[in-house]
Amino acid sequence: MRSAKLKFEKRKSRIRYKISKTSNRMRLSIFKSCRHIYAQIIDDSKSITIAAASTLDKKIKKIKKSHCNIENAIKVGKEIAKKADSAGIKEVVFDRGGYKYHGIIKALADAAREKIKF
């Protein structure tokens, strides 16, 4: 039986392979640690980060409770959508980075969908 880490890595590589086929759009990449959530919009053709948001930002960090929860994921999603809109990005590819589309990842994606299409 495979360990959880191997399943995660396999899922991550499968997602990245599918995303690499759509190289004409920017990539919304998500990373989640035990304490924080990070979101970046990356241009893979130029290898640069266009916009970034996380629970470490001063606007989101004001709440002293747990940083990695659904409420903060919604705030990060809205913040990354606002930064993408100001940068003129309307359409991205969602890279969930091997995480299952559930809970915190789903909340962040739904909040980002208000201004970004993916």
Swiss-Prot record:
Q: Which GO terms describe its biological process?
A: translation
- One GO CC term of this entry? cytosolic large ribosomal subunit
Give the Gene Ontology MF terms in alphabetical order. Answer: 5S rRNA binding; structural constituent of ribosome
Q: Which UniProt keywords apply?
A: Ribonucleoprotein, Ribosomal protein, RNA-binding, rRNA-binding
For the keyword Protein transport, the answer is: no
Q: Do you know which NCBIfam families this protein is assigned to? A: L18_bact (TIGR00060)
Q: Which family does it belong to?
A: Belongs to the universal ribosomal protein uL18 family.
Protein role: This is one of the proteins that bind and probably mediate the attachment of the 5S RNA into the large ribosomal subunit, where it forms part of the central protuberance.
According to UniProt, the name of this protein is Large ribosomal subunit protein uL18
Question: What is the native source organism of this protein?
Answer: Rickettsia prowazekii (strain Madrid E)
